[in-house]
Amino acid sequence: MPTILVSALEASSNVHLEELRRNLPKDYRFIGVFEGKEALYSPREFSIMGFRDVIGRLGFLLKAHKEMVQLAKQADMVLLMDSSSFNIPLAKKIKKQDPHKKIMYYILPQVWAWKKWRAKSLEKYCDFLGAILPFEVGYYQKKAQYVGHPLLDEIKYYKKDIKGETLVFMPGSRKSEIAKIFPLFVKVAQILEQNEGFKRRVLVVPSFFKGLDLKALYGEDIKLFEISYDAHKSLFEAEFAFICSGTATLEAALIGTPFVLAYRAKTMDFLIARMFVNLHYIGLANIFYNALNNETPGLGESQLHPELIQHFLSVEGLLKAYEEMDRERYFKESLRLREYLASGSARKIANGMAFLLNLT
């Protein structure tokens, strides 16, 4: 029975991990950080945003890091997913502890956007790099393989036309995101009802919020919305979506649902990030759409969907995006993006894990 040390700190990584486990033999045992009863820590304990937040949780992060390195001694191999600030140093320490321990990195850091030197670190400490974007492989010498984007394995609903019955609102999965974005979405929903009459308003809530007091998280205005824990189905049924930056924006693009990206960070965090990351776009769909059109990812001229970031984010801007978006063009181009990203990611990663285990 192979034992796999997993480090999956993000909510989206755990969705991908769930699909991966469906493609693995039932006797694989998982330990580490992931959504599951047998985990050392839940990903929710790592749900922090911003530089100040990291400093405040530094003691916990160092403790978790040390425990994961020790836990690696029990594992036959290591699977790291996303979260490069935690996982690259983890890979380094595990390799130092046991140079023969096989390490796979799935959902690679965005070295094409910033910190390109991380590519060398990954190749030094990891044995298999699963790239989910076609253009990522070019940033590595030999260990990266394109495996397809995992969302195309996970999404079961794809629009055949742009029709929809509801308005979907997705203000993020972190409390800080919800606090900044949800009040704007509430005002948008109220104004649209005044202008266009009643439409079903669906608030998509992360599945890991089940059982929590949603009114405490979202406030009294949550009563204006229907609650859904199924993002894919809700997006499929929607006429339009208002979405906080993140994986959900790419999900909407692949499903074919028109949307506008909304994002606002703490001012200091935003300014610091701008010092390191120089991109025109932050939305994954726009970044990948640039690559599809043979432009530098995140720096191209082409745009699939509107983005309203920081001080550009307003109720008026969101309403304008809803009213003026060319839905026919968007739908046509979203189909091109879907074809570009391919599928079969989970199966290929499962095969890669089996290969590494055979080498141990």
Curated annotation (Swiss-Prot):
Note whether Protease occurs among the keywords.
Answer: no
Q: What is the primary gene name for this protein?
A: lpxB
Q: What SUPFAM superfamilies does the record point to?
A: UDP-Glycosyltransferase/glycogen phosphorylase
Q: Which domain of life is it from?
A: Bacteria
Alphabetically sorted, this entry's keywords are:
Glycosyltransferase, Lipid A biosynthesis, Lipid biosynthesis, Lipid metabolism, Transferase
According to UniProt, the name of this protein is Lipid-A-disaccharide synthase
**GO BP annotations, alphabetical order:** lipid A biosynthetic process
Native species: Helicobacter pylori (strain Shi470)
**Which cellular component, as a GO term, is one annotated location?**
membrane
Give the HAMAP family listed for this entry. LpxB
Family to which the UniProt record says this protein belongs: Belongs to the LpxB family.
Its Enzyme Commission number(s) read 2.4.1.182
The record's annotation in InterPro entries points to:
Glyco_trans_19
Pfam families, per database record: LpxB
Function, as annotated: Condensation of UDP-2,3-diacylglucosamine and 2,3-diacylglucosamine-1-phosphate to form lipid A disaccharide, a precursor of lipid A, a phosphorylated glycolipid that anchors the lipopolysaccharide to the outer membrane of the cell.
Pathway info: Bacterial outer membrane biogenesis; LPS lipid A biosynthesis
The reaction(s) annotated as catalysed by this protein in its Swiss-Prot or TrEMBL entry are: a lipid X + a UDP-2-N,3-O-bis[(3R)-3-hydroxyacyl]-alpha-D-glucosamine = a lipid A disaccharide + UDP + H(+)
> Which GO molecular-function terms appear in the entry?
lipid-A-disaccharide synthase activity; phospholipid binding
PANTHER family annotated for this entry? LIPID-A-DISACCHARIDE SYNTHASE, LIPID-A-DISACCHARIDE SYNTHASE, MITOCHONDRIAL-RELATED
